[in-house]
């Protein structure tokens, strides 16, 4: 078998973007560049677990450019970040909204970054409800619990009070990178990578 055939077989079913993400993964860089759903959450959780198993002492860098999405899928990513023995450095770029903002602020303290033109948006979680009156009441109770839990966690990560987070997230609250730093969502605004892109 020639080298060309081997290379063609190795790359079969893999497009250019797949090979870029594979290369980034080898550098301990993972990327959330879509809406948060179960599929991307499972992929990111698996990547965090893999990198944690390979070397539990080295940082993992999570780059976020996401409009948000599913609360349960996002919480799976968040819990895996906290479960990992590795520090998770988070980088907000482009847009980190809703669950994207939550994951950005949930990175390891001191290692949460925003690029200068990133926009960050915080708001309360939203959910569609339906069914019988009893079902709707149960869903409303679950939703209120989720809203409270997320506000408590954001308060813990930002240093803001629970009351302030509840007030500020009642409607869409937009931040520039610098405003996000002042609020406590990120620790640093960075314009260029100093040294390797991963920590």
Swiss-Prot record:
CDD domains: S14_ClpP_2. Pfam families: CLP_protease. InterPro entries: ClpP, ClpP/crotonase-like_dom_sf, ClpP/TepA, ClpP_His_AS. Its EC number is 3.4.21.92. One of its GO terms (molecular function) is ATPase binding. One of its GO terms (biological process) is protein quality control for misfolded or incompletely synthesized proteins. It comes from the Bacteria. Keywords: Cytoplasm, Hydrolase, Protease, Serine protease. One of its GO terms (cellular component) is endopeptidase Clp complex. It is found in: Cytoplasm. It catalyses: Hydrolysis of proteins to small peptides in the presence of ATP and magnesium. alpha-casein is the usual test substrate. In the absence of ATP, only oligopeptides shorter than five residues are hydrolyzed (such as succinyl-Leu-Tyr-|-NHMec, and Leu-Tyr-Leu-|-Tyr-Trp, in which cleavage of the -Tyr-|-Leu- and -Tyr-|-Trp bonds also occurs). Gene3D superfamilies: 2-enoyl-CoA Hydratase, Chain A, domain 1. The active site is at 98 (nucleophile), 123. Fourteen ClpP subunits assemble into 2 heptameric rings which stack back to back to give a disk-like structure with a central cavity, resembling the structure of eukaryotic proteasomes. Belongs to the peptidase S14 family. Cleaves peptides in various proteins in a process that requires ATP hydrolysis. Has a chymotrypsin-like activity. Plays a major role in the degradation of misfolded proteins. This is ATP-dependent Clp protease proteolytic subunit 2. It comes from Corynebacterium diphtheriae (strain ATCC 700971 / NCTC 13129 / Biotype gravis).
């Amino acid at each position: 078998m020639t080298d060309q055939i081997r290379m063609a077989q190795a790359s079969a079913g893999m497009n250019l973007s797949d090979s870029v993400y594979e290369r980034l993964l080898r550098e301990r860089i993972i990327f959330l560049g879509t809406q948060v759903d179960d599929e991307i959450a499972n992929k990111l959780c698996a990547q965090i677990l893999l990198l944690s198993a390979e070397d539990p002492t080295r940082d993992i860098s999570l780059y976020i450019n996401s409009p948000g999405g599913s609360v349960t899928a996002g919480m799976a990513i968040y819990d895996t970040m906290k479960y990992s023995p590795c520090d998770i450095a988070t980088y907000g770029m482009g847009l980190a909204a809703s669950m994207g903002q939550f994951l950005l602020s949930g990175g390891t303290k001191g290692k949460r970054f925003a690029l200068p033109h990133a926009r960050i948006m915080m708001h309360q979680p939203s959910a569609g409800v339906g069914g019988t009156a009893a079902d709707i009441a149960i869903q409303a109770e679950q939703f209120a619990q989720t809203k409270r839990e997320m506000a408590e966690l954001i308060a813990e990560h930002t240093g803001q009070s629970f009351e302030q987070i509840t007030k500020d997230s009642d409607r869409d609250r937009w931040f520039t990178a610098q405003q996000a730093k002042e609020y406590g969502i990120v620790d640093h605004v960075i314009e260029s990578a100093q040294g390797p892109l991963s920590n």
